[in-house]
Amino acid sequence: MCIRDSQIPIYQNTTWKYDSSEFMGRLFDLEEEGYFYTRLQNPTNDCVAAKICELEGGSAAMLTSSGQAANFYAVFNIAGCGDHVVCSTSIYGGTYNLFAHTMKRMGIEFTFVSPTCSDEELESAFRPNTKAVFGETVANPALTVLDIERFAKAAHDHGVPLIVDNTFPTPINCRPIEWGADIVTHSTTCLLYTSRCV
């Protein structure tokens, strides 16, 4: 009899067994794909990431420990010390503080523009060292809606990606990639997981 679970198993282990120390070394050096520390990756997380990726219409996904970690990695994998990011003013306060204070101390500058700014104001926010544009689909808590197509066009005209935090609408209500976003983040404990509704 074939048993197919309707729920994925929860892998609780933190470490894995390996056939050789050489293979383990390649894993730790990120030269091989596989599991070596569950905080970074495990089969449960991979399954959840794949489901969210499918819902968003994306090509790849990963889970992080929080929505703030997702936003940090989305920006920090693109921008480093001496770089610049254009960002909507209507974003979650924690994200604003991450960008305006923490990442500023790391040498990344942010220019904040209103999501309802004119095309000229948006254009003037770009610099030669701009590496990305960031916004929230529906801002938390202001509920301001980002014109994803307009911000995507501005980003792409400058050869940089648009990163969109899609926490509030979730991919059930909006799929930013279909409107031009390149990277989508979530705080899954907010609405995807519905922990506040149970």
What feature does the model see in each segment?
Residues M1-D5, Y193-V198:
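Conserved small/polar residues in nucleotide/adenosyl-binding loops
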Residues R4, D29-E32, G135, I183-V184:
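Short, functionally important structural connectors and interaction interfaces within domains
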Residues D5-S21:
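N-terminal amphipathic/basic leader segments beginning at the initiator methionine
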Residues S20-F72, G94-M103:
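Conserved N-terminal alpha-helix of the aminotransferase class I/II PLP-enzyme fold
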Residues A61-R196:
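Conserved PLP-enzyme active-site core in the AAT-like
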